[in-house]
């Protein structure tokens, strides 16, 4: 059955990559959450999508140039209603300490394709192991060298190739990393029924992103996609129940 992942939490309605968005995503029926991680100036793993703080918080500047003590003072609901003014940027450990008490999948996207954070892989893996969620985590990144490093450091933790491009002989490429998941962009030529079938036959799990149109959700469910990432998990969950 197709797994629903709340992309940055239930980010279509709530401030993305916040504890509120993750909680609402699971409440909406998602099978898992997707989150993004960057490193602060002092090496803390924070959950935020952009390299800069500007778009989603009340602060400005690069995450990498800002100490965590300053990041934690920010309002992480920039652009949202004042009712969310007390929402903060979570640490990865905040999310994992909440998740460990529940039962859902956790896709951690390492945001290290623009800024190559030294030691990010080791820090993320240490946190995953410390909270004993290795069997529930999927590691993904656009930086496939980083994914290969994760494979060497922790071969037992699931990995997925994240891409916005069409990969030539994608199944062979994914196996060479090695990884067992393929996370392509929903509107790319890499997301066809033929590709889905070929990947599944090769035991590669296909989970496209970001799937917000009901017609795309329905197509993936009918094609037997292993999963999808959506900002609106309640819509995808409702469609899945009707299949």
Curated annotation (Swiss-Prot):
* Domain GP-PDE stretches: 2-240
GO BP term (any one): lipid metabolic process
Which PROSITE patterns does the UniProt record give?
Answer: GP_PDE
Q: List the disulfide bonds.
A: none
Q: What is this protein called?
A: Uncharacterized protein YqiK
**One MF term from GO for this chain?**
phosphoric diester hydrolase activity
- At the top level of its lineage, which domain of life is listed? Bacteria
Q: Note the InterPro entries from the entry.
A: GP_PDE_dom, PLC-like_Pdiesterase_TIM-brl
């Amino acid at each position: 059955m197709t797994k629903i992942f709340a992309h940055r939490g239930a980010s279509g309605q709530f401030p993305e990559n916040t504890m509120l968005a993750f909680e609402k995503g699971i409440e909406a029926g998602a099978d898992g959450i997707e989150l993004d991680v960057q490193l602060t100036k002092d090496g803390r793993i924070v959950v935020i999508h952009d390299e800069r703080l500007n778009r989603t918080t009340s602060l400005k500047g690069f995450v990498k140039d800002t100490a965590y003590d300053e990041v934690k003072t920010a309002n992480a609901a920039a652009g949202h209603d004042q009712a969310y003014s007390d929402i903060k940027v979570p640490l990865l450990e905040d999310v994992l300490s909440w998740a460990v008490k529940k039962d859902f999948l956790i896709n951690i996207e390492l945001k290290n394709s623009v800024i190559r954070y030294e030691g990010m892989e080791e820090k993320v893996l240490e946190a995953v192991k410390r909270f004993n969620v290795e069997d529930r985590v999927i590691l993904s990144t656009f930086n496939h060298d980083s994914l290969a490093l994760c494979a060497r450091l922790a071969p037992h933790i699931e990995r997925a190739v994240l891409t916005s491009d069409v990969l030539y002989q994608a199944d062979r490429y994914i196996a060479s990393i090695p990884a067992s998941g393929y996370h392509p962009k929903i509107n790319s030529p890499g997301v066809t029924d033929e590709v889905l079938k070929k990947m599944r036959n090769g035991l590669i799990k296909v989970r496209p992103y970001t799937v917000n149109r009901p017609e795309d959700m329905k197509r993936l469910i009918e094609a037997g996609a292993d999963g999808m990432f959506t900002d609106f998990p309640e819509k995808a969950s409702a469609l899945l129940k009707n299949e």
